[in-house]
């Protein structure tokens, strides 16, 4: 009987796994190496604030118009209040639109700017293709 206990104990020892500190997976990963300055992506440009510091809001007139129509159907005394709310909403948006950049530019000037920007993109793409075709940018295949 004693021999069976020893054999059973050996089997139990064989099935035991080594402590976690000896397992290769439990080693902490090496600290990440800092990227070279050239490899860092450019910082994201901050989103331009809308003029007058306005928040991103939904400027839908549909709810206000719906309220006005409901009040007209019911002959509600709140009709003037809803109409004034709609009127102030229009005024706020007129001010906001007036402060937007480029609103003063005529459509002809906008077309000229668009044409010149497209021309710049075309020439830059051509230059980029030329630079890509140079030998120094080819990556050797191992």
Curated annotation (Swiss-Prot):
Residues 17-49 have a biased composition (Pro residues). The modification Phosphoserine is found at residue 106. It holds the Pfam family Med9. It comes from the Eukaryota. Component of the Mediator complex, which is composed of MED1, MED4, MED6, MED7, MED8, MED9, MED10, MED11, MED12, MED13, MED13L, MED14, MED15, MED16, MED17, MED18, MED19, MED20, MED21, MED22, MED23, MED24, MED25, MED26, MED27, MED29, MED30, MED31, CCNC, CDK8 and CDC2L6/CDK11. The MED12, MED13, CCNC and CDK8 subunits form a distinct module termed the CDK8 module. Mediator containing the CDK8 module is less active than Mediator lacking this module in supporting transcriptional activation. Belongs to the Mediator complex subunit 9 family. This is Mediator of RNA polymerase II transcription subunit 9.
